[in-house]
Regions:
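Short, cationic motifs built from Arg/Lys/His that form the positively charged side of catalytic pockets
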Residues: 38-42, 92-94, 150, 202-206, ...
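Pyridoxal 5′-phosphate
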Residues: 9-11, 172
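Active-site-adjacent segment of FAD-dependent monooxygenases/related oxidoreductases
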Residues: 8, 86-88, 213
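Conserved mid-domain beta->alpha element of the FAD-binding
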Residues: 31, 130, 134-215
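C-terminal helical "tail/cap" subdomain of flavin- and related membrane-associated enzymes
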Residues: 100, 166, 181-257
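Conserved FAD-binding catalytic core of PHBH/FMO-like flavoproteins
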Residues: 2, 15, 28, 32-134, ...
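Core beta-strand elements of the Rossmann-like FAD/NAD(P) dinucleotide-binding domain
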Residues: 19-28, 32, 148
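Conserved SAM/SAH-binding loop
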Residues: 1-5, 19-21
Length: 257
C-alpha cells in the first residue's frame, strides 16, 4: 500500500510525497488517514481536546453457547459495571466493558467472568472461544479547522471520540457524502463556497457528537455508589415515548442534516 509521508500546497493544488519518494499532484487532498493523520499534521491543522479519559476498556470477540440473542445489541448496566454484548455477522459476539485493569489479550476465563458478573443472570451463557481481543482508552479530539486551502479533513483525521452511542461511523459517512458534493462543485465550477460550508458545518456537528458521546460514556461508567439510582432512573425514563423517540433520533443522527 502507498503511505503518505508529507504534503505541500502549491498555487493551484497540492503535492503529496509518498514514503517511496514518489510525488503525486492533485487539485485537492482529502486527509482521511485516521486519528494519527500525517497529512493533517503536515498541514499544521491542530487536533485539540482530551488525550485520553481516565477509563480502561476491554474488548473481546467471542463465541458463546446459549444465553444471548443474536439479533440485538444488549447493554447490561450491572452493579459491577457496564457490559455491552453485540452480535457479529459471523455468529460471534463482541463484548466491551469498562474495567480497572484491562488485559492486553483477554482469554476465555476472563470473558466468562465478565458474563457471569455483569451479563444475564436468568440464563447461562458459556464462552467457548476468544476469536480476538484487545484493550483501548478513549480520546476526544476535534480538529481546530477542517480546511486549509487545498487540504480538507474527513473522518477520524478530523474527529475522534468515545464509541458510546455508535456515532463514529455515521459521522464519518456524513463527512464523506457532504465533502463529495462540495468537491464536485469546486472541481466543476471553481466555486469553493461549499467547501467552506463543509468545513464549518461538519466541525460543528463533530463537536456536538463528541459532547453527546462524552455524556453517554459518563452515564455508562458512573461510580458504583450511584449506579442503582442511574439504573432506576433509566428504567423509569424508558416508559416515556418522548424520551425513547428523542434518544433514538439522537443516536441515529436523523435530526441533523
Amino acid at each position: 500500500p502507498y503511505v503518505a509521508a508529507g504534503v505541500k500546497q502549491t498555487a493551484d493544488g497540492a503535492e503529496v510525497t509518498l514514503d517511496s519518494g514518489e510525488v503525486i499532484q492533485a487539485q485537492y487532498v482529502v486527509a482521511a488517514d485516521g486519528m494519527n493523520s500525517k497529512i493533517r499534521d503536515a498541514a499544521g491543522l491542530g487536533f485539540d481536546g482530551r488525550d485520553t479519559l481516565p477509563l480502561n476498556f476491554t474488548l473481546a470477540d467471542v463465541r458463546i453457547e446459549g444465553g444471548l440473542p443474536k439479533d440485538e445489541v444488549l447493554l447490561y448496566f450491572s452493579r459491577p459495571g457496564l457490559l455491552v454484548a453485540a452480535p457479529l455477522p459471523d455468529g460471534s459476539f463482541r463484548l466491551v466493558a469498562e474495567v480497572e485493569e484491562a488485559p492486553e489479550h483477554p482469554d476465555v476465563a476472563y470473558a466468562q467472568r465478565l458474563l457471569n458478573t455483569r451479563g444475564p443472570q436468568e440464563t447461562t451463557a458459556r464462552v467457548t472461544e476468544v476469536v480476538w481481543g484487545s484493550r483501548f482508552r478513549i480520546h476526544e479530539r476535534v480538529a481546530d479547522r477542517y480546511r486549509d486551502r487545498r487540504i480538507v479533513l474527513a473522518g477520524d483525521a478530523a474527529h475522534t471520540h468515545s464509541p458510546a452511542g455508535g456515532q463514529g461511523m455515521n459521522l464519518g459517512l456524513r463527512d464523506a457524502v457532504t465533502l463529495g458534493d462540495a468537491l464536485a462543485e469546486a472541481l466543476t465550477s471553481g466555486d469553493e463556497n461549499k467547501l467552506d460550508e463543509y468545513a464549518t458545518n461538519s466541525r460543528a456537528e463533530a463537536v456536538r457528537v463528541v459532547s453527546l458521546a462524552h455524556r453517554l460514556t459518563k452515564l455508562a461508567t458512573a461510580p458504583a455508589v450511584i449506579r442503582p439510582a442511574r439504573n432506576a432512573g433509566l428504567h423509569l425514563l424508558s416508559y416515556l415515548p418522548g424520551f425513547r423517540r428523542g434518544l433514538a433520533e439522537q443516536l441515529a443522527a436523523i435530526g441533523h442534516r
